[in-house]
Amino acid sequence: MSDLPIEFTELVDLMSLGISPQFLDFRSTTFESDHFVTVRETKDGTNSVAIVDLAKGNEVTRKNMGGDSAIMHPSQMVISVRANGTIVQIFNLETKSKLKSFTLDEPVIFWRWLSETTLGFVTARSILTSNVFDGNVNAKPQLLTLRHANLNNTQIINFVANKNLDWFAVVGILQENGRIAGRIQLFSKQRNISQAIDGHVAIFTNILLEGNGSTPVQVFVTGNRNATTGAGELRIIEIDHDASLPSQYQKETTDIFFPPDATNDFPIAVQVSEKYGIIYLLTKYGFIHLYELETGTNLFVNRITAESVFTAAPYNHENGIACINKKGQVLAVEISTSQIVPYILNKLSNVALALIVATRGGLPGADDLFQKQFESLLLQNDYQNAAKVAASSTSLRNQNTINRLKNIQAPPGAISPILLYFSTLLDKGKLNKEETIELARPVLQQDRKQLFEKWLKEDKLECSEELGDIVKPFDTTLALACYLRAGAHAKVISCLAELQQFEKIIPYCQKVGYQPNFLVLISSLIRSSPDRASEFAVSLLQNPETASQIDIEKIADLFFSQNHIQQGTSLLLDALKGDTPDQGHLQTRVLEVNLLHAPQVADAILGNNIFSHYDKPTIASLSEKAGLYQRALENYTDIKDIKRCVVHTNALPIDWLVGYFGKLNVEQSLACLKALMDNNIQANIQTVVQVATKFSDLIGPSTLIKLFEDYNATEGLYYYLASLVNLTEDKDVVYKYIEAAAKMKQYREIERIVKDNNVYDPERVKNFLKDANLEDQLPLVIVCDRFDFVHEMILYLYKSQNLKFIETYVQQVNPSKTAQVVGALLDMDCDEAFIQSLLQSVLGQVPINELTTEVEKRNRLKILLPFLEQSLSQGIQDQAVYNALAKIYIDSNNSPEKFLKENDQYDTLDVGHYCEKRDPYLAYIAYEKGQNDDDLIRITNENSMYKYQARYLLERSDLDLWNKVLNQENIHRRQLIDSVISVGIPELTDPEPVSLTVQAFMTNGLKLELIELLEKIILEPSPFNENVALQGLLLLSAIKYEPTKVSSYIEKLDNYDADEIAPLCIEHDLKEEAFEIYDKHEMYGKALKVLIEDIMSLDRAASYADKINTPELWSQIGTAQLDGLRIPDAIESYIKAEDPSNYENVIDIAEQAGKYEELIPFLLMARKTLKEPKIDGALILAYAELNKIHEIENLLAGSNVANLDHVGDKLFENKEYKAARLCYSAVSNYSKLASTLVYLGDYQAAVDTARKASNIKVWKLVNDACIEKKEFKLAQICGLNLIVHAEELDELVERYESNGYFEELISLFEAGLGLERAHMGMFTELAILYSKYEPDKTFEHLKLFWSRINIPKVIRAVEQAHLWSELVFLYAHYDEWDNAALTLIEKSTKDLDHAYFKEVVVKVSNLEIYYKAINFYVKFHPSLLVDLLTSLTPRLDIPRTVKIFSKSDNLPLIKPFLINVLPKNNSVVNQAYHDLMIEEEDYKALQDAVDSYDKFDQLGLASRLESHKLIFFKKIGALLYRRNKKWAKSLSILKEEKLWKDAIETAAISQDPKVVEALLTYFVETGNREGFVALLYAAYNLVRIEFVLEISWMNSLEDYIKPFEISIKKEQNDSIKKITEELAKKSGSNEEHKDGQPLMLMNSAMNVQPTGF
């Protein structure tokens, strides 16, 4: 496929990422761009969204989501979620922020991102847009327009807009004429009008037309397939035409090709690549169409997927299209930039179109055409068009073309070709480096900087340092822009400094990683602007990359030395932010300078705790001198210094001073407090109190109290303790506070403390208050009240005659304690008048119950009578009042019975207990009123008051109470029962108590007593003789306890419920009595039921029915006979009753018993009144059983309501096929009719009927029958309808194969491949069948349909069939390159396709296969080995490979390979190559290798070569020794082989005089005068003059050393002359500093004192 004009890629398989196929559809999966795929999933009732990030290696992120739809932003991690159709929320997943949250008025049907910022919505009536990033979270979308009527009843599938968001199109599809039709609503925002268009897809795009310069034309592209004719059409029209443009786009219309078998296919997506001018149109069935945008020419059509596509998005910056099919494959298509132009030239033979495409996109493939056209136009002197052609071709955009066009003179009045060339390029895009430089010079020279700047801003120029150099003389700022774009860092820094934009230097250096000389920059800035210099230095410090490059001490010294204290301080404050110990001297320095020159600054520095490592004693002393006592105290540690400073309270903030004591220990704190009090106690007492209050826990309250007491500071003590008393747990502290408050006469405070405080010792405080005898006794009253010293308090107050405080206590403090006060006063024999007066003053506030208790203890109740009566008159309804009055009336015998009966307010229990010993009857009255059951029963039993008890029980009518008194353990039960029967019952007229009494008797097992009671009530004259309930109860009791009396009771009694009594009789086996009751009350049906079900005599029942002779009884007896399986009798009874209502049971039982003959009359009777399917169905079944087919035909021909499907099924089960056929035919049930025809042997009719049924199960049945009868043509018809269902394939194939019908099976699948519903399983199964039975056809089938088969399944089949070529083909197309390569190695020893093997093996993932392949080639294909190794080199472990061949002694086989990999300079490769060259005695190649590549054991190789027989190798060994500075070894070999030139070079290279002198000596000794002279020349600088003179004198070589001597003399003279000149210059003038060096000033040079650093 390398020559195709498209590149086809599978981006990801969503199912392989865990996405369930059930969610791969248009509603659940959204695809806004080639960045994200979003899938909404539901699992276990929980919604989640899976986000597949295609740009991050298909990373899957899952998030819980409560919504029903979600889409991702095209490029950002922004997700939009929709819930309930109307609620929309948009989140940024990276920042975890909410961008939008709103609720629409109607549900969103479709939504899509229209741009990077705008989201579009389509509802049932409206089209809306929302700017997601406008910052307004709650803003609702804006209404764009209303939906057009042409979108009614459509499914919205797309919403698009142009770049300016002023044209919009909404696309919908619907079913029409059996096809999918498309509708488009085109809307113009500016004109506010909509237009309805037919179409399935739409998109807006731009195109540059020839002659319009760089201004594009807007076009609207639509694709449509006519629902009526099926014809496809692509339309391209211009919108918003600009009349000022010379060229106008002409409307283009092109046919869209659809294959004949794709009748239901339609366009589903369209994308346009503006860069290349290509339209991509994708159809539902996976066909991709390519069109050229300007001409509308169809370029290419192919199918990219066999599965249907449901969504698509732009791909690769909108230069391609991506889509998702139903199997979850994300597929992408874009043009092949290298093949599209050749394809148009070669396949379409359209040269003009090829040039258009190549020109627009700058694509290769038409370079020769451009070159020829360019040359032709030049020859024709058509320079303008030649320039345009050159600008249109990337291959012609070079310096040669520029030079040629520059040298052409334009005709008069015409634009020069070079300017036309540049203008064309600028219209189309960006100039390259050479073009920019060529254009810049003339433009700037003509002073057209604005034009140049315009091009620069539009990014039309490629910037370089050379361009900046050209621009700088004209405009430094413009040059800076060029340098910035070109990355010329040094030039950028220079320009920024020249423009004084210092603040931009550091950010730029950080950005580009450039390091300038900061000291020089800072020095220059200090001179011009100290503030800016300080800011610049601070910025350097704040940058971790530059902070380490500067010396902060030197910089600070520069500031301070020039008296820039503020700037130097600011710098050091930033520099010393770390506050580390090593910065201590600098911290001290900053503080010293500022304490001397700016104390306020020093105060602020110390106050902010910026430093902690300075010299604190020194700074403290300076602070004290400067009057900064606070700072001095913060740094002093000696108590003497602290006490000296701390007394300056007027200069110290009080809050700080108080807090300062927290830094002192207890002893120091006390010393300072004493110093403050000694200095000026009046002025400092407030401070002392605050300190004592804050640090009370630390110093101790006792110590502080003693301190205050020692100085007699009562007021201070009071205020100090006031701060503690509410929080302390110390009793002594509270006591001291009460004492101090008493001295200060703060009685209200004492009152507050004793009232609210819970810590003090009440006994101690009470005694203190009694002894203090305060003017106000209220604190004492409160203490005694709180801690229950009331009695003692009353005694103290009564004795001291403080009666007003007694009244105050009762009236104001605690009226609830009045009872105790009264008791105490009574104990003191206080005057009753005072007591009564006291009580009258607190009327309504006294707890009367307690009061009466206290007074009752002292037998003085009568004293309360006036108080109680006054209380009642005041409306007090307290129960205790009535209790007390009752007791007083009882004791005084003042009409107590009347009071107890008439009054309801008293406590009946309390008063009753009070009366029990005085008068039991009064107690009975009280208990009866209060329904105090237990006490009433007790006193009536104790006092033999049984008749009162009986009356009370009957009146109460409480079953639980009855059960209690009737308990057999009650010794008084008999007397009570007698009283109830003799006295209680005769007095009653209400039946309810009687009934409850009876129930109580029954509950307590009083059987005989109950019957006795009931007989007396009912059988003797009483108001209850005719009571239904009691008569029933009597019968019930008799049934249970005296069954023999039941018959007599039935005769005597009439007023009872027969429906209740008769079932009880049956329950207790009194069946005849039950029959008598029913018969007596004329309940014939129930009487008959007793005969049938209980007495179980059907004959007696039949006689009874005959006697009564009603239809109801006949129906009832018929049902009983049916249940007893007397079927004929039952049917006869039903017929007599003319009752068909029980037809279901009659039919079921009769059919089970086979009584069809008897059943038919019943059914005919039933059909007269009922129209029931079961009746008609049963009649058909009965006729069928009796073989009355004619009657069935007559029945079916007439009116009937039978469920013929169900009846047919029953007949089919009973093998009554003829009758079944009649039923199925009558309802046109082709599925079952086909099955029936199969059993009737009519196969052709069965197939025809199965086609009408179109049911898999039917096709299978008919197919099985046809196969069994060898009706293969009919079987194939059935099979073709089965194989399109993948789940039926296995069973169908097994059926054919088990019968040996292989050819017929293959023929079936071959015929099925052309079906529209052909699926992967069919192609797969046919491939397997070919591999088994017709292997020759396998490869061809695989090559045609490899993309449509299940490759793993076919791999197993071809492997079993030993089809190795096919196996390799499948492995390769399944990307299992490892298996493909291994199969080729194992199975292709002879007929190996070397080129194909190389293509396969380079793609393997397991590199061990490389080495298997190498061994395979060594063994079978050694001549191709080097070519293989060359292909494998990029991933090959070369050392390992070389070792393999070294061990097997096969290095010569890979010599070219070794040469090829030598540049990698690997030691193993080098060693192997050396071995090979030594073996081949190729010294030249060896020399080149050791010179070029140094990674090998050089000394080891030298040692090997030293002993080689050839002198050339020995020379190489010597050179290796020389390279490793083994001079002696090297010279030894060279001297031995007389290689004098190399020896002289070696000695000179050594730079060692000893080596040189040794070789000189050797030359003298061996008489080699030429070598001696040559060495003197080569090593001239290494030889000592004295050594040369000596050896030449001793060996008479003076003439040979003359040149050497002359050179030495000349050097000496030159040196002397030079020294003389330098001395003369120094004596003439002093040496000056050189310009350009950094200014490094020392303290001494600036005449300043040492800074203390």
From Swiss-Prot:
Renumbered residue ranges of the record's region WD40-like repeat 3: 108-152
Start and end residues of each stretch annotated as Flexible linker: 484-527
InterPro entries: ARM-type_fold, CHCR, Clathrin_H-chain/VPS_repeat, Clathrin_H-chain_linker_core, Clathrin_H-chain_N, Clathrin_H-chain_propeller_rpt, Clathrin_heavy_chain, TPR-like_helical_dom_sf
CHCR repeat placement: 543-689, 692-834, 839-978, 985-1130, 1134-1275, 1280-1426, 1429-1572
GO molecular function ontology, one term from the record: structural molecule activity
Positions of region (Involved in binding clathrin light chain): 1219-1528
Region named Binding site for the uncoating ATPase, involved in lattice disassembly: 453-469
Covalent cross-link site, Glycyl lysine isopeptide (Lys-Gly) (interchain with G-Cter in ubiquitin): 1107
Family matches, as SMART domains: CLH
Keyword Ubl conjugation: yes
Region (WD40-like repeat 4): 153-198
Region of interest called WD40-like repeat 1, as start-end residue ranges on this chain: 23-66
Keyword Hydrolase listed: no
Region called WD40-like repeat 7, residue ranges: 308-336
Principal location class: membrane
WD40-like repeat 6: region residues: 264-307
Region of interest called WD40-like repeat 5, as start-end residue ranges on this chain: 199-263
UniProt-annotated stretches for the region Globular terminal domain: 1-483
Membrane topology: Peripheral membrane protein
Segments of this protein annotated with the region Heavy chain arm: 528-1653
GO biological process, one term: intracellular protein transport
Pfam families in the record: Clathrin, Clathrin-link, Clathrin_H_link, Clathrin_propel
Biological role stated in the UniProt entry: Clathrin is the major protein of the polyhedral coat of coated pits and vesicles. In yeast, it is involved in the retention of proteins in an intracellular membrane compartment, presumably the trans-Golgi.
Record remark on domains: The C-terminal third of the heavy chains forms the hub of the triskelion. This region contains the trimerization domain and the light-chain binding domain involved in the assembly of the clathrin lattice.
Record's subunit section: Clathrin triskelions, composed of 3 heavy chains and 3 light chains, are the basic subunits of the clathrin coat. Interacts with the auxilin-like clathrin uncoating factor SWA2. Interacts with INP53.
Protein name as catalogued: Clathrin heavy chain
Organism, as annotated: Saccharomyces cerevisiae (strain ATCC 204508 / S288c)
Gene name of the record: CHC1
